[in-house]
């Protein structure tokens, strides 16, 4: 089996990741180690948190908002209104809530386009307590750009709208972690929604001239995480 070192550089806004990894040219399915369901779950969770972190870093700043949308008694009753008598309550209510958040996103997109306002968001439908892992009352977490916040907030009529600015730091790993740990895992899905106008990370791959290369951050940067084959840093703004 032929192997050689490759370097991957991922640019997510002001956050840069520099990764060295061993690449195999003829790896077969038989070469891959079989993983337990728990190992697969943790691997998928790590991937989803990584991807959402990069998406947030690319598109949102400390000026933007982290929003929690709740359901009042009347709002929750509306979610259950059309539930068939024998249908399980939790899956039905969860799907009904997902329909409501998608309606809100579509409505906000329409009104923002009408007003000439850019609208960007990432959202999850949450019903898990991140501390106890028990079921929690259903709600939504949304990251919204500041320009669209006034319109977005005015369109939610099912309960309260709780807002705060996103964390004033370049790396939004903990925000992505907080959002996804409250979402039930569904195989084959990212478990978060987004508007289609979000920028994607820029990924560059190359074969390093020196396989023993030491990853060193530039001078005008703040190191977020550093290891032998992995470096994540934020470029300092002038």
Please identify what each model-predicted range represents.
Residues 1-136, 146-238:
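Right-hand nucleic-acid polymerase module
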